[in-house]
């Protein structure tokens, strides 16, 4: 990851005003907060449970990175992590995080993290940290041109707009009300919201603006990376479903692995554009790639994930 002086675009997020008071992000104070039990041993307690009733993979990745970051010095920062989800997590039981200090070098340090429940590993992760270093060799892709977040509806307003449609199919109405009732610690604005009154066949690509709810601040680069790890798993694998949703209904979907590469400092409590695409699906699996862009056009994070996707053909339904 490049120099730490600039954690994001200079304009920041003006729509928030000054949140440095008592609106500390719940992702920092609760969701990613770990209790130290011993040296390199931590316990996580607070879990957001999606509709699958399993632990949210992004939270496990984020907490594992929090644990790993506690074992390295202040002058090194994560540049990559590679994770496997090996068992389903139990949201009713705390997760223990064991950190192994695999290597501590002058420029690079490697940490292995194992997340355990009921005496068995549910998740394993390798994270590599690097001391900040200048580099004359630099390049990146160009950020897509999209409307700014201020011109787009937030998730709550978009759902409300869908629900006001008198022609909305009842099953979508039920699902949207369920989504609206959930408390999610991130804010999302879709760049091209889908029409829900009919199933569409879309390209396996989507983009949305995303940021953590609440205030994190400028100082803790490591925490912003941990929050980005949480954010990166949200709606990510679903990108692989977009070309198939008109013909197939998914009855099982779960992440198998997750990788991230951190390129430049950023603030996870400022809007970032998440550009997601799925280059391949087959063998009951789907592959997705993602890029998190700062508002000033800097590529901050690259992500990749493969997951199990099991589906069955849709039965034709009458349209209401």
UniProtKB/Swiss-Prot annotation:
Enzyme Commission number(s):
3.1.2.1, 3.1.2.11, 3.1.2.2, 3.1.2.3
Per UniProt, activity regulation is: Inhibited by CoASH (IC(50)=10-15 uM). Also inhibited by cysteine-reactive agents.
Catalytic reactions of this protein: choloyl-CoA + H2O = cholate + CoA + H(+); chenodeoxycholoyl-CoA + H2O = chenodeoxycholate + CoA + H(+); acetyl-CoA + H2O = acetate + CoA + H(+); butanoyl-CoA + H2O = butanoate + CoA + H(+)
Residues at the catalytic site: 233 (charge relay system), 255 (charge relay system), 305 (charge relay system)
Q: Where do we find the motif Microbody targeting signal here?
A: 318-320
Its annotated compartments are: Peroxisome matrix
Please list the disulfide bridges: none
Question: Which one Pfam family would you cite for this protein?
Answer: 4HBT_3C
Task: Please verify whether the record's keywords include Lipid metabolism.
Answer: yes
Q: What would be an example GO MF term here?
A: acetyl-CoA hydrolase activity
Q: Which UniProt keywords apply?
A: Fatty acid metabolism, Hydrolase, Lipid metabolism, Peroxisome, Peroxisome biogenesis, Serine esterase
Q: Tell me which GO cellular component terms the UniProt record holds.
A: peroxisomal matrix; peroxisome
Q: Mind listing the GO biological process terms from this record?
A: acyl-CoA metabolic process; dicarboxylic acid catabolic process; fatty acid catabolic process; negative regulation of glycoprotein biosynthetic process; peroxisome fission
Q: What does this protein do?
A: Catalyzes the hydrolysis of acyl-CoAs into free fatty acids and coenzyme A (CoASH), regulating their respective intracellular levels. Displays no strong substrate specificity with respect to the carboxylic acid moiety of Acyl-CoAs. Hydrolyzes medium length (C2 to C20) straight-chain, saturated and unsaturated acyl-CoAS but is inactive towards substrates with longer aliphatic chains. Moreover, it catalyzes the hydrolysis of CoA esters of bile acids, such as choloyl-CoA and chenodeoxycholoyl-CoA and competes with bile acid CoA:amino acid N-acyltransferase (BAAT).
- Indicate the family of this protein: Belongs to the C/M/P thioester hydrolase family.
What is said about its interaction partners and assembly? homodimer.
PANTHER family recorded: ACYL-COA THIOESTERASE (PTHR11066), ACYL-COENZYME A THIOESTERASE 8 (PTHR11066:SF34)
Q: Which protein, by its recorded name, is this?
A: Acyl-coenzyme A thioesterase 8
Species of origin reads: Rattus norvegicus
Q: What is the lineage of its organism?
A: Eukaryota, Metazoa, Chordata, Craniata, Vertebrata
**What gene name does this entry carry?**
Acot8
């Amino acid at each position: 990851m490049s120099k730490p002086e600039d954690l994001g675009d200079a304009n920041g997020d003006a729509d928030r005003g000054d949140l440095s008071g008592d609106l500390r992000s719940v992702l920092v104070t609760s969701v990613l907060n770990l209790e130290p039990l011993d040296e390199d041993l931590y316990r996580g307690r607070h879990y957001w449970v999606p509709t699958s009733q399993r632990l949210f993979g992004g939270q496990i990745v984020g907490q594992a990175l929090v644990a790993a970051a506690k074992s390295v010095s202040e002058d090194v920062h994560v540049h990559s992590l590679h994770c496997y989800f090996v068992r389903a997590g139990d949201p009713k039981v705390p997760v223990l995080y064991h950190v192994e200090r695999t290597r501590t070098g002058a420029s690079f340090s490697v940490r292995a993290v194992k997340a355990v429940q009921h005496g068995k590993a549910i998740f394993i992760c390798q994270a590599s940290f690097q001391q900040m270093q200048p580099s004359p060799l630099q390049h990146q892709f160009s950020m897509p041109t999209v409307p700014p977040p201020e011109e787009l509806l937030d998730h709550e307003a978009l759902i409300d707009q869908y629900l006001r449609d008198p022609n909305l199919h009842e099953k979508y109405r039920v699902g949207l009300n369920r989504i609206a009732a959930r408390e999610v610690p991130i804010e999302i604005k879709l760049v091209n919201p889908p029409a829900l009154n009919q199933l569409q066949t879309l390209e396996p690509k989507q983009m949305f603006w995303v940021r953590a709810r609440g205030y994190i601040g400028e100082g803790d680069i490591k925490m912003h990376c941990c929050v980005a790890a949480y954010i990166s798993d949200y709606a990510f694998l679903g990108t692989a479903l977009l070309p198939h949703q008109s013909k197939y209904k998914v009855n099982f979907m779960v992440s198998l692995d997750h990788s991230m590469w951190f390129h430049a400092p950023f603030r996870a409590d400022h809007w970032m554009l998440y550009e997601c695409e799925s280059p391949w699906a087959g063998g009951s699996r789907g592959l997705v790639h993602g890029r998190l862009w700062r508002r000033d056009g800097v590529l901050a994070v690259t992500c990749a994930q493969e997951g199990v996707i099991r589906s069955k053909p849709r039965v034709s339904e009458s349209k209401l």
